[in-house]
UniProtKB/Swiss-Prot annotation:
<dbReference type="InterPro" id="IPR023509">
    <property type="entry name" value="DTD-like_sf"/>
</dbReference>
<dbReference type="GO" id="GO:0000049">
    <property type="term" value="F:tRNA binding"/>
</dbReference>
<comment type="subunit">
    <text>Homodimer.</text>
</comment>
<keyword id="KW-0694">RNA-binding</keyword>
<dbReference type="InterPro" id="IPR003732">
    <property type="entry name" value="Daa-tRNA_deacyls_DTD"/>
</dbReference>
<dbReference type="GO" id="GO:0005737">
    <property type="term" value="C:cytoplasm"/>
</dbReference>
<dbReference type="GO" id="GO:0019478">
    <property type="term" value="P:D-amino acid catabolic process"/>
</dbReference>
<feature type="short sequence motif" description="Gly-cisPro motif, important for rejection of L-amino acids">
    <location>
        <begin position="137"/>
        <end position="138"/>
    </location>
</feature>
<keyword id="KW-0963">Cytoplasm</keyword>
<dbReference type="GO" id="GO:0043908">
    <property type="term" value="F:Ser(Gly)-tRNA(Ala) hydrolase activity"/>
</dbReference>
<dbReference type="GO" id="GO:0051500">
    <property type="term" value="F:D-tyrosyl-tRNA(Tyr) deacylase activity"/>
</dbReference>
<keyword id="KW-0378">Hydrolase</keyword>
<dbReference type="Pfam" id="PF02580">
    <property type="entry name" value="Tyr_Deacylase"/>
</dbReference>
<keyword id="KW-0820">tRNA-binding</keyword>
<dbReference type="GO" id="GO:0106026">
    <property type="term" value="F:Gly-tRNA(Ala) deacylase activity"/>
</dbReference>
<protein>
    <recommendedName>
        <fullName>D-aminoacyl-tRNA deacylase</fullName>
        <ecNumber>3.1.1.96</ecNumber>
    </recommendedName>
</protein>
<comment type="similarity">
    <text>Belongs to the DTD family.</text>
</comment>
Length: 145
């Protein structure tokens, strides 16, 4: 399981000219599920993102989590994070999870995430999404579980 999280002042996801997710201060998380991912991976990733201290405290130190500041998050499914880029000039997705399985796995991750934290919005799996955000920092982290 892979994720890139970004601390944002605002973010939104639009599909077919319709806004499907819209947050103010919080996290935009690009999430990629892989073939071998299990519920345990989903639990660990959700905990990591929810508890990761990327927001500044009163002293300006990154010491506060999503929960600490009661912020929102958008989970955006992004299979391209699993691309093999080692050879040539075109990404390969041959080792990726088939779309129908990846969709089920992403939904399972989303459900686990929602059980742990309630201020969650999502993009739409498989849709052509227009994602816009205003980075805060920028502060960006990459996770592999």
């Amino acid at each position: 399981m892979l994720s890139i999280i970004q601390r944002v002042n605002c973010a939104k996801v639009v599909v077919d000219n319709q806004k499907v997710a819209d947050i103010n201060k919080g996290i935009l998380a690009l999430v990629c599920v892989e073939k071998e991912d299990t519920q345990q991976n989903f639990e660990k990733m959700a905990d990591k993102i929810i508890k990761y201290r990327i927001f500044e405290d009163d002293a300006g130190k990154m010491n506060l989590s999503l929960v600490d500041i009661d912020a929102e998050i958008i989970l955006v499914p992004q299979f391209t994070l699993a691309a093999d880029t080692k050879k040539g000039n075109r990404p390969s997705f041959s080792s990726g999870c088939p779309p129908e399985i990846a969709k089920e796995k992403f939904k399972e991750f989303e459900n686990i995430f929602r059980r742990k934290y309630n201020k969650v919005q999502t993009g739409i799996f498989g849709a052509d999404m227009k994602v816009s955000l205003t980075n805060d920092g920028p502060v960006t982290f990459s996770f592999k579980i």
